[in-house]
Every structure is written in structure tokens, then in C-alpha cells.
Amino acid sequence: MASMQKRLQKELLALQNDPPAGMTLNERSVQNTITEWFIDMEGAQGTVYEGEKFQLLFKFSSRYPFESPQVMFTGENIPVHPHVYSNGHICLSILTEDWSPALSVQSVCLSIISMLSSCKEKRRPPDNSFYVKTCNKNPKKTKWWYHDDTC
């Protein structure tokens, strides 16, 4: 537990001091607990999400960094994207099978920024309706099938 807290403190400091472009840690979210962070995000300039505001929720288990955080979009504005379900779940391989303890909150944020920035057309995943009706509340409990190599 102590190593997890130490790692999260280090990553929290890095995120506060040098956040990825368009991302801001919601400081109030970490006042009571180190294991749940809200990160505010703005769509990058020149993308289909330019100027839109989103919020990410990161939840860390006691096994972090050996286990990936639970990451999902939350709030009223969930991006319409081929790899983002309308309930906020994100189909991104580094959040599951491609996770490595060498990755960090910063690297997850950069991957999400890149995923959104490369989108050319706003649309939901083809199985959105079925998935949202049948999925677990925790996206980490989903057995993801990556339909393409851009997840």
C-alpha cells in the first residue's frame, strides 16, 4: 500500500506541475482521497473536439502500478468517438492487456488525447447500445475485443 501511495503522490505532483496540454487536475478531487482523481480535459485545437470540455475519472486500486487504473469519461459530456461508449467506458488497450507499470497517469492522458485528436468523424462504437445495456459498471471487468489497431 505504501508503494502505491508513494507512486501516486509522485504522479500527482507531476500532473500538477506539468500537465499534458488541455488537461487539468481537478484539485478538489484529491483533497479527501489519493485513489480517485478527476481530470478536466479540453478538446485539442484543430480537432473535431476543439473547445469541447470533458472529464476523466481515474480510480486506483491498491495494486497500482502493477494493475492499470480504472479510467472512464464521466459527467454530462461524454465524447462521441468510435472507441468511447456512451456510458464513458474507453476501449484503449493500455487500460487493460497492454498496461505496464512503466506507464503513468500522464501516459494514459496522452494516449487519450491522441485517440481523440486522430478522430475524423464523431460516431459511437457499432455495439454501443448492446454494450451499455449489458456491461459491468467497472470497464476493467470487460473482456474487450479490439476491432482495429487504433484502440
From Swiss-Prot:
Positions annotated as active site in the UniProt record: C91
The keyword Nucleus is assigned to this record: yes
Pathway terms, separated by semicolons: Protein modification; protein ubiquitination
CC terms in the record's Gene Ontology section: nucleus
Keyword list, A-Z: ATP-binding, DNA damage, DNA repair, Nucleotide-binding, Nucleus, Transferase, Ubl conjugation pathway
Annotated UBC core domain residues: 3-151
Gene3D superfamilies: Ubiquitin Conjugating Enzyme (3.10.110.10)
Primary location: nucleus
Catalyzed chemical reaction(s): S-ubiquitinyl-[E1 ubiquitin-activating enzyme]-L-cysteine + [E2 ubiquitin-conjugating enzyme]-L-cysteine = [E1 ubiquitin-activating enzyme]-L-cysteine + S-ubiquitinyl-[E2 ubiquitin-conjugating enzyme]-L-cysteine; S-ubiquitinyl-[E1 ubiquitin-activating enzyme]-L-cysteine + [acceptor protein]-N-terminal-amino acid = [E1 ubiquitin-activating enzyme]-L-cysteine + N-terminal-ubiquitinyl-[acceptor protein]
One GO-annotated biological process of the protein: protein quality control for misfolded or incompletely synthesized proteins
EC numbers: 2.3.2.25, 2.3.2.23
Subcellular location: Nucleus
GO molecular function: ATP binding; ubiquitin conjugating enzyme activity; ubiquitin-protein transferase activity
Top-tier EC class: transferase
SUPFAM superfamilies: UBC-like
Family membership: Belongs to the ubiquitin-conjugating enzyme family.
Function: Accepts ubiquitin from the E1 complex and catalyzes its covalent attachment to other proteins. Catalyzes monoubiquitination. Involved in degradation of misfolded chaperone substrate and DNA repair.
Name under which the protein is recorded: Probable ubiquitin-conjugating enzyme E2 W-A
Organism the protein comes from: Danio rerio (Zebrafish)
Name of the gene this protein is made from: ube2wa
